[in-house]
């Protein structure tokens, strides 16, 4: 069986809890992307910090191993759809938290028009109505790979898979109204 790994926090909290500018910025992001709480935002901010930290370290590094790690970092960000193919390490340093949050499953379900609101997108995901390439994903914070983006659909067993479902008809009417 072995010893299980120790569970660690996957995020860093802000160093000072009451900075008004940061609180205002976080509140806007939580509302825009319908995050459950600030912890979800801090997890993605920590991810972004780690990408940027690695890029700064690799910009200063020389050698064969540094070249390999540069290519791996850029390839990872390109697979996630955060950066375009052929990007440079300087592009990693200019990433913002919005670039990460735009790749969440919750955001992409809303943008594809599978839900009326971003909050409804979260509910559909948590309730198991959304699948990615045939696999039901119940985590709204799942970062969708670029190649998986076209595979986001309603689940086969979901009532939403039926095109005559009343809620789907409402969603389609809303989309038609926005298109006009």
From Swiss-Prot:
Record-linked CDD domains: S4 (cd00165)
Describe the task this protein carries out.
One of the primary rRNA binding proteins, it binds directly to 16S rRNA where it nucleates assembly of the body of the 30S subunit.
Q: Per its UniProt record, what SMART domains does this chain match?
A: Ribosomal_S4, S4
A Gene Ontology biological process in which this protein takes part is: ribosomal small subunit biogenesis
Q: Name one GO molecular function term.
A: structural constituent of ribosome
Entry's Gene3D superfamilies? RNA-binding S4 domain
* Lineage of the organism: Archaea, Methanobacteriati, Methanobacteriota, Thermococci, Thermococcales
- Residue span(s) of domain S4 RNA-binding: 103-174
Which residue ranges traverse the bilayer?
A: none
> Under the cellular component aspect of Gene Ontology, which terms does the record hold?
small ribosomal subunit
Which gene does this sequence derive from?
rps4
| NCBIfam families on file | PRK04051.1 (NF003139), uS4_arch (TIGR01018)
In Swiss-Prot or TrEMBL terms, this protein is called Small ribosomal subunit protein uS4
Q: Which family does it belong to?
A: Belongs to the universal ribosomal protein uS4 family.
Mind listing the UniProt keywords for this protein, alphabetically? Ribonucleoprotein, Ribosomal protein, RNA-binding, rRNA-binding
Instruction: Describe the protein's quaternary organization and the partners it interacts with.
Output: Part of the 30S ribosomal subunit. Contacts protein S5. The interaction surface between S4 and S5 is involved in control of translational fidelity.
InterPro entries, alphabetized = Ribosomal_uS4 (IPR022801), Ribosomal_uS4_arc (IPR022802), Ribosomal_uS4_CS (IPR018079), Ribosomal_uS4_euk/arc (IPR005710), Ribosomal_uS4_N (IPR001912), S4_RNA-bd (IPR002942), S4_RNA-bd_sf (IPR036986)
């Amino acid at each position: 069986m072995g010893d299980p790994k120790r569970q660690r926090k996957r995020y860093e909290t802000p160093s000072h809890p009451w900075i008004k500018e940061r609180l205002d910025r976080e509140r806007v992001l939580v509302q825009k992307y319908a995050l459950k709480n600030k912890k979800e935002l801090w997890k993605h901010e920590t991810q972004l910090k780690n990408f940027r930290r690695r890029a700064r370290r690799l910009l200063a590094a020389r050698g064969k191993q540094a070249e390999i790690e540069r290519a791996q970092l850029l390839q990872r960000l390109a697979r996630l759809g955060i950066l375009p193919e052929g990007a440079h390490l300087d592009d990693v340093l200019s990433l913002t938290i919005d670039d990460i949050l735009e790749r969440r499953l919750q955001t992409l379900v809303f943008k594809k028009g599978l839900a009326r609101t971003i909050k409804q997108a979260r509910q559909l995901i948590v309730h198991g109505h959304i699948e990615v390439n045939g696999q039901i994903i119940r985590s709204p914070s799942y970062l969708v790979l670029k190649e998986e983006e076209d595979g986001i659909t309603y689940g086969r067993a979901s009532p939403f898979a039926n095109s005559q479902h009343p809620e789907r008809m409402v969603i389609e009417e809303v989309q038609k109204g926005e298109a006009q």
